[in-house]
């Protein structure tokens, strides 16, 4: 079973990579872009067959490694 996870900076946390991308896009004439937030995307293949158990396991992974809970949020898809 494949579980997908998106990790993004929390609202209010500075995102220097996102800001740099936004500024570069503006300089390339994409002037309508007012903000970019950069995050991480994970696809985790698990041998667990039960979706509920697999998502709970991936949630533990997010809390322990994949996301820095002080500055990042995560969403399991």
Q: Could you say what each language-model-derived stretch is?
A:
Residues 39-46:
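Surface-exposed aromatic
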Residues 2-39, 53-77:
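Long, contiguous binding/interaction regions
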């Amino acid at each position: 079973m494949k579980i997908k996870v998106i990790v993004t900076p929390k609202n209010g946390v500075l995102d220097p990579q996102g800001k740099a991308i936004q500024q570069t896009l503006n300089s390339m004439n994409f002037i309508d872009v007012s903000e970019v937030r950069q995050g991480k995307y994970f696809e985790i293949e698990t041998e667990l067959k039960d979706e509920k158990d697999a998502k709970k396991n991936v949630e533990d992974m997010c809390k322990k490694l994949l996301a820095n809970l002080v500055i990042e949020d995560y969403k399991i898809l």
